[in-house]
Curated annotation (Swiss-Prot):
Disulfide bonds: none annotated. Component of the ubiquinol-cytochrome c reductase complex (complex III or cytochrome b-c1 complex) that is part of the mitochondrial respiratory chain. The b-c1 complex mediates electron transfer from ubiquinol to cytochrome c. Contributes to the generation of a proton gradient across the mitochondrial membrane that is then used for ATP synthesis. Belongs to the cytochrome b family. Heme 1 (or BL or b562) is low-potential and absorbs at about 562 nm, and heme 2 (or BH or b566) is high-potential and absorbs at about 566 nm. This is Cytochrome b. The keyword Coiled coil does not apply. The gene is MT-CYB.
Amino acid sequence: MTNIRKSHPLIKIINHSFIDLPTPSNISAWWNFGSLLGVCLALQIITGLFLAMHYTADTTTAFSSVTHICRDVNYGWLIRYAHANGASMFFIFLYFHIGRGIYYGSYNFMETWNIGVILLFLVMATAFMGYVLPWGQMSFWGATVITNLLSAIPYIGPMLVEWIWGGFSVDKATLTRFFAFHFILPFIITAMVMIHLLFLHETGSNNPSGLNSDSDKIPFHPYYTIKDILGVLLMLLTLLSLILFSPDLLGDPDNYSPANPLNTPPHIKPEWYFLFAYAILRSIPNKLGGVLALAFSILILMLFPALHMSKQRSMLFRPVSQCLLWILVANLIILTWIGGQPVEYPFITIGQMASISYFCIILILMPTTSFMENKLLKW
């Protein structure tokens, strides 16, 4: 009799995706982040569902309903902080996952890569709308500032902003629709993840050497399932430490004050994982220019396959390119720091320099370096 996992129509798909999947034998811990992101997504959907059972999407009761979750619901504080800090873990892993893709040239799987960039946009939209829901000061003003950016679009901008708001300012209608979108988007993300995996399994995984690994593959289970479980345990250890010891470390104290349209906080800033893009937005004095730079700072990821000039796929044997990538990482850390600082000298200048160098490294220096490395190797 044929094994059920190889014959059953549904189990067969799972078998080909997670059990008998031929996987390169040399993939490192950098390949763990895909599964970690999957676990994060599941965790966010589960905790989010339990939060939605007690949350009310109304301007008069939203803030107090979150307080009620933390104080009166059994383990409500745990669910709330697991959801908030789970989002931070999600973005840490996302950035590692993208960084791995750039370092090892995984962006040459173009369909997988482009679906991944769309996924990044969807996750960013979901996180932004989720940040608005507790209806604290930073929720309200963050929503006002970020949605207002659309008014920079010529001709239709102001009309578009009022359409998103559902009125003449961020109010009850805005909160209700943001809750609806925040609830539905994770399921759309899950569907996109399946497409992401479908495209990945068409080509098979990349590996650190960047070479074809068809001659040396091993089954995903048990070798990589056990490796992924180790990653998940380390993630849960980190996440639980964060939740139980310093749950508000990555949050903003302003969000513990209820939203007040008459009182603007001294520094309006998004969550830490958006600060690099926020710094790029602020570093351009023109509103439309800033919005375009903000969009392009993420969209630039789609250009990586076109900017790949090297004859080698991976950066493993390209020390100069490696050096440039780590400079880019340092640059992004500087941008993240600047995004959280007030708009004054010297932060404005540092932000502008970091923004220019961000685009220069990706668009000019990395392709030029790859070209030079080819010449040095007489390729």
